[in-house]
């Protein structure tokens, strides 16, 4: 069953990237992140009360709570980097770099969670790394060219923090009902996101958010909520070194919709990279 949750997470995560891209064409990425986190938090707590897990709140241990908070901080940092990268770079390049966090996640899972690393997983890591390199070599669009290579730094930061999120989340979610754990860590992300808005002086931009972009920001929040609930349920029941690669298959959904919505096309080199990324991901499932 956890495999189905992992694939559900991938579907919603793929939609999240496209919806978020639609919502940050004019809206500041930090402001958009803070707004969408409100939606995710509301969605998460709604699920908590639907399944009745709020009664277990007092039973959460200090260790579990600590790792949930750390996971939330890592998630917040990953989001801030990711949506800034999406704002200034091509979605077809940003997403592969972000998804390369799978490599680091697996290595950390082997080191800290003592999960096994087979020959197939090792080959998958190599393919994933090679595919990511091929995809980020894709020709830049006019908008991305103006931004230079700064998108790559933000995308890489997103990948590092995302991998930490998976490991910290795996440790934290093991001692609490998955919906409740997701809701708690989302609260941490919310606080961090709004702190960044006001610390960077972006609060004045809240009133300038276009209504049509606000709709997409909220929809991306709902998609994120769905992805998180599926992901952490899968992470609770399944190994992180397998759940994470399945979740990263969201790249297929993202690239399909980026072609349909943003008309971003893949070159032969980047298409080969996509095949390598998907092939590497599937190898990790063996």
Show where each model-derived region lies.
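Alpha-helical transmembrane segments of compact multi-pass small-molecule transporters, enriched
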Residues: 38-43, 97-111, 188-192, 246-260, ...
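Membrane-interface interhelical linkers
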Residues: 1-11, 20-68, 79-89, 137-154, ...
């Amino acid at each position: 069953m956890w495999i189905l949750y992992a694939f559900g997470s991938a579907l919603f995560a793929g939609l999240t990237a496209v919806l978020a891209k639609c919502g940050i064409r004019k809206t500041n990425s930090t402001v958009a992140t803070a707004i969408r986190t409100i939606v995710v938090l509301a969605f998460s707590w709604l699920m908590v009360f639907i399944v009745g897990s709020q009664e277990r709140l007092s039973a959460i241990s200090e260790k579990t709570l600590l790792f949930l908070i750390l996971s939330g901080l890592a998630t917040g940092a990953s989001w801030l980097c990711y949506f800034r990268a999406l704002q200034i770079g091509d979605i077809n390049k940003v997403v592969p770099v972000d998804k390369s966090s799978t490599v680091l996640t697996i290595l950390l899972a082997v080191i800290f969670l003592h999960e096994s690393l087979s020959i197939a997983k090792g080959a998958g890591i190599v393919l994933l790394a090679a595919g990511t390199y091929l995809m980020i070599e894709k020709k830049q669009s006019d908008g991305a060219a103006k931004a230079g290579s700064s998108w790559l730094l933000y995308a890489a930061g997103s990948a590092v923090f995302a991998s930490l999120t998976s490991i910290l989340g795996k440790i934290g979610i093991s001692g609490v009902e998955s919906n409740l754990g997701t809701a708690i860590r989302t609260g941490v992300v919310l606080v961090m996101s709004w702190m960044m808005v006001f610390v960077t002086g972006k609060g004045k931009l809240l009133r300038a958010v276009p209504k049509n972009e606000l709709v997409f920001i909220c929809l991306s929040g709902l998609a994120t909520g769905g992805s998180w609930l599926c992901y952490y349920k899968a992470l609770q029941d399944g190994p992180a070194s397998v759940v994470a690669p399945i979740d990263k298959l969201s790249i297929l959904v993202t690239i399909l919709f980026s072609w349909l919505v943003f008309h971003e096309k893949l070159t032969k080199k980047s298409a080969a990279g996509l095949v390598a990324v998907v092939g590497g991901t599937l190898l990790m499932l063996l």
